Structure formats: structure tokens, C-alpha cells
């Protein structure tokens, strides 16, 4: 190993392993650019095309030429009034949307398992937060998005809600039919922000869930997660007319935007409009065929829509491999990694794979062979029997108020009755057990110890201590 270039050398070594990439980025380490001649040119000339704001290439912060044209094509494809390129990922889009849609002190509904950047935006904008409970699915650490009842139940508990932030779909590729809900919420005067980070490809063909960007006020889309875009490339799709939005986008984005990322975003929209329907239809046909073969092995099963409650849909271009009780998703991920198959993530009872038209056929053959060869004894984890619960503790302070105070680390035994400063998040499943500003109870301490005793990582816990407001 070249010790003078540790990161670069690690990337080179990983590339030489020739792994099958069933994780982000959506360009699958460049393979997705090989769809046509111009995509190949982009892939092979990344160094040559790394340019800045010279005269013919426009300016992302004040687009008047080719970037303006690209944004107009993007808005037309997704069916929205305005569209923006984001080079700082969806995080900058979430922050810009929150600051544009809401004012300090506004009451806003959010899913408890929303993205970290949404939490950051709520704190920075000094908003009053009302949580929507996630839906526990089975006992394996798999959660569903909130359904209609969860959403309206949360609204009824609000005093004067100004808006709502929903995730569509979640990390598992699962979504709830929220079209009518969005229309109703907008009639009530609520601003609607959709974090569609994992759904950039939605609507490309009829077998995929719908593109709901035309309905929402703001939709944030991570092109780099599923499309042939470079990491950090995302879209913000807008139907709201707030004149301050452009300022917030510039404020939360670098003044030196990467033209490589922007070019890949332009290519991703072009790819969807020209090849999306054909390629995703073919991908899903292959994925459905291979799903039957994998399920017939009797070792893992690919989660299907038929297993989910009414009203839920699942992305057929994403595999959620679920193990029987007593087997470890983390160990399955490690096993597949040893077979040069890169998963997106593991959860308590399985793994998530993000498929792509770029590598689906060869990748599926490799995946099937690895699962066929799998000795299930390698994945046994019978000692772990934790039950995943959804507890929403009493809120004593708004999250933004917490950061006006100093914190102190205290032992779990001494934390009952204290107000949490740093959120406590078991991973998996990645949903905050206690958020900033909430009160610790005996029940919560028992939940934390349950996760720790099972060997599950709990973010916000350090040597059995947590950070509370001093």
C-alpha cells in the first residue's frame, strides 16, 4: 500500500477487487455512463471536463445560458414549475426547502426517521417539531412509512401546523400512496416537502412507483443514488413561488460547483427521458424472474408488495433480502462482501440491494450463485431477540433550544428525568429512540440497554454515558 496516499490507494484497491455494486452510487462506479457514446465520453474524460465558470459554460448561481437550458429540460421532465441542480447532495436541497417554506417558530410535522439533514434544518430554522410515528413491520427491524391514519393523527395533535415533511420512499424502497394526502394537505394551507432521495427514477416506467414531484411544493431527489450521476449530485424540484428560494439554495451550496457533477446531472435527466422506460422495464423483468429463483432456494426471501399492508408499494428495482428469525443481516452483508457483492446496507434481519440497468444481469447471476452456495449456519445469531418498539418520549424543549445550553455526559443510571442534548439512535433501525430536547425515562433506559446487550450500535451512547442538558 502507498502510505503517502492512503485514501487514493484504498480506492484503487477497491476498484481492483471488481465487486458487483448493489449500493450507491447509481452510476455503479461508472458503468451506467456506458449506455451511449456521449455517456462514455463523459466517463473517459472526467479530468478533461473538470472546468469552472468560463464564458461559454454559464454560472450555477446565476444561470443565463446552458445551465438555464438544462434546468428547464429537467423541470419539463419531472413536471414541475422550476428545477435546480444541487452539487452538495440532497442535504442542501432539504435545508433550502425548509428555509424557504417556513419561518422561525412555525409548527412542522416530520417523520421521526427523517434524514439527518432534515433534523439539521429543523434546528437551524428554529422550528417547532411534531413527530409522525413510524410503522413497525414484523420483528426484524424493518419499518414502514407512516400511513394515512398516522399522518392525520399527528396533525390533530398540532396547534397550528404550517407544513409537513414526508419521505417517499424510505431506505427499503417502500412508499405509501400519498397523492390524495398531499392534495388534501395543500388545500388546508400546509406546505409539503417530499424527501424523495431514493426515488429519482420513479415514474420511468409503469412498474415503478409514481413520480409525485408535480404535486408537492418541494421535492428533493438524490440523482446520485439511483441514476448515472456522480456522488453529491441531486435535484430540487419546485412548485412553490417563494422569491427567497434562490438565495437559500446559494447559501447552502458551494460557490465553486463541480461542472463534472452538473454534467452528470444533465446526463441523468437525458438518460431517463431517452432510455428510462426501456431500461427500467427490462431491469424489473429480470429482477422479478430472479426473485422467484432466489425465493425457491429457501434461504432468504425477497420482500414483495403482497406482504405489505394495503396502501403500500415497493420499488421493484430494489431488493430487500429478509432472513428467517435467528439469522443476522449484518452477517449476510459480510458474507456477500466476501463474494465481492457490495450491499447498500444491512438491517437486523436482512440487507438492501440497489439494482441498476447497468449491471443487473451479470450481477444477478453472481448474487444467485452466492446465495445458492450460502451455508446458513454462518449467519446464525439466535442469541439476539430484541423487539423493535416505537417510543415517542415527552418533549421538554424544542431541538433548537437545546443548543443554547451546555451539555454534560452522565451515566445511563443517572439519566432518568434528564433532557437529552444529543439524539440517541440505535442502528439498525436508525430511528431516534430519543431526540434532542426529549426526556429520559426508565423505559427508555431499558430500551437502550436492550440494544447494547444485543451488540447493536447505539449512536449517542459513549461508554454507557449520554449527553444531556446541563
Describe the predicted segments one by one.
Residues 47-90:
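Conserved N-terminal alpha-helix of the aminotransferase class I/II PLP-enzyme fold
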Amino acid at each position: 500500500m502507498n502510505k503517502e496516499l492512503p485514501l487514493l490507494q484504498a480506492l484503487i484497491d477497491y476498484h481492483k477487487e471488481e465487486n458487483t455494486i448493489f449500493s450507491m452510487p447509481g452510476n455503479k462506479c461508472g458503468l451506467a455512463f456506458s449506455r451511449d457514446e456521449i455517456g462514455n465520453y463523459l466517463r473517459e474524460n472526467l479530468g478533461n471536463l473538470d472546468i469552472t465558470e468560463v464564458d461559454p459554460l454559464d454560472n450555477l448561481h446565476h444561470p443565463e445560458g446552458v445551465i438555464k437550458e438544462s434546468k428547464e429540460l429537467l423541470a419539463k421532465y419531472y413536471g414541475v414549475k422550476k428545477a435546480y441542480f444541487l452539487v452538495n447532495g440532497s442535504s442542501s436541497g432539504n435545508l433550502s426547502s425548509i428555509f424557504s417554506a417556513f419561518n422561525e417558530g412555525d409548527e412542522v410535522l416530520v417523520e421521526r426517521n427523517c434524514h439527518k439533514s432534515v433534523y439539521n434544518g429543523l434546528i437551524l430554522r428554529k422550528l417547532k417539531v411534531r413527530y409522525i410515528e413510524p410503522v413497525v413491520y414484523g420483528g426484524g427491524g424493518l419499518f414502514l412509512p407512516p400511513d394515512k391514519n398516522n399522518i392525520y393523527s399527528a396533525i390533530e395533535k398540532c396547534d397550528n401546523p404550517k407544513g409537513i415533511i414526508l419521505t417517499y420512499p424510505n431506505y427499503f424502497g417502500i412508499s405509501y400512496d400519498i397523492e390524495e394526502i398531499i392534495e388534501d394537505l395543500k388545500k388546508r394551507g400546509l406546505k409539503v416537502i417530499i424527501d424523495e432521495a431514493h426515488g429519482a427514477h420513479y415514474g420511468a416506467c409503469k412498474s415503478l412507483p409514481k413520480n409525485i414531484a408535480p404535486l408537492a411544493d418541494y421535492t428533493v431527489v438524490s440523482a446520485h443514488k439511483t441514476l448515472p450521476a456522480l456522488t453529491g449530485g441531486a435535484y430540487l424540484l419546485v412548485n412553490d413561488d417563494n422569491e427567497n428560494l434562490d438565495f437559500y439554495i446559494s447559501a447552502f451550496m458551494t460557490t465553486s460547483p463541480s461542472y463534472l457533477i452538473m454534467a452528470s446531472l444533465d446526463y441523468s435527466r437525458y438518460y431517463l427521458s431517452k432510455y428510462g422506460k426501456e431500461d427500467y422495464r427490462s431491469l424489473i423483468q429480470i429482477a422479478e424472474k430472479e426473485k422467484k429463483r432466489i425465493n425457491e432456494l429457501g434461504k432468504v426471501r425477497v420482500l414483495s408488495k403482497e406482504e405489505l399492508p394495503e396502501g403500500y408499494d415497493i420499488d421493484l428495482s430494489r431488493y430487500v433480502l429478509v432472513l428467517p428469525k435467528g439469522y443476522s443481516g449484518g452477517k449476510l452483508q459480510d458474507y456477500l462482501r466476501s463474494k465481492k457483492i457490495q450491499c447498500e446496507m444491512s438491517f437486523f434481519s436482512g440487507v438492501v440491494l440497489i439494482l441498476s440497468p447497468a449491471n443487473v444481469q451479470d450481477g444477478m447471476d453472481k448474487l444467485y450463485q452466492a446465495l445458492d452456495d450460502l451455508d446458513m449456519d454462518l449467519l446464525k445469531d439466535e442469541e439476539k431477540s430484541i423487539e423493535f418498539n416505537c417510543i415517542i418520549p415527552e418533549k421538554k424543549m424544542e431541538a433548537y433550544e437545546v443548543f443554547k445550553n451546555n451539555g454534560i455526559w452522565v451515566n445511563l443510571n443517572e439519566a432518568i428525568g434528564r433532557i437529552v442534548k444529543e439524539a440517541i439512535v440505535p442502528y439498525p433501525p436508525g430511528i431516534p429512540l430519543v431526540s434532542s430536547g426529549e426526556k429520559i425515562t426508565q423505559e427508555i433506559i431499558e430500551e437502550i440497554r436492550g440494544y447494547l446487550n444485543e451488540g447493536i450500535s447505539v449512536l449517542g451512547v459513549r461508554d454507557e454515558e449520554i449527553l444531556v442538558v446541563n
